From Swiss-Prot:
Species: Indian citrus ringspot virus (isolate Kinnow mandarin/India/K1/1996)
Transmembrane region(s): 7-23
Function: Plays a role in viral cell-to-cell propagation, by facilitating genome transport to neighboring plant cells through plasmosdesmata. May induce the formation of granular vesicles derived from the Endoplasmic reticulum, which align on actin filaments.
Entries under InterPro entries matching the protein: TGBp3 (IPR003411)
Name by which UniProt lists this protein: Movement protein TGBp3
Lumenal side: 1-6
Entry keywords, A to Z: Host endoplasmic reticulum, Host membrane, Membrane, Transmembrane, Transmembrane helix, Transport, Viral movement protein
Cytoplasmic-facing ranges: 24-60
Amino acid sequence: MHYIDWVILLTFAAALIVCLTPKPEPCIITVSGASATVSNCPNPELLTDLVKALKPAKPV
């Protein structure tokens, strides 16, 4: 096979792998008052702590 044939074959193989791998669901972060809830994440406890740390203590 020629070099260009290998390039095309590898491009199609990479595209097929990307299409067949499952896409992760987006995290849902809900902030209400002083509470924050995180759902659809692999580690929701860590993200909840992060959201609480980034949230200002007093409303501006």
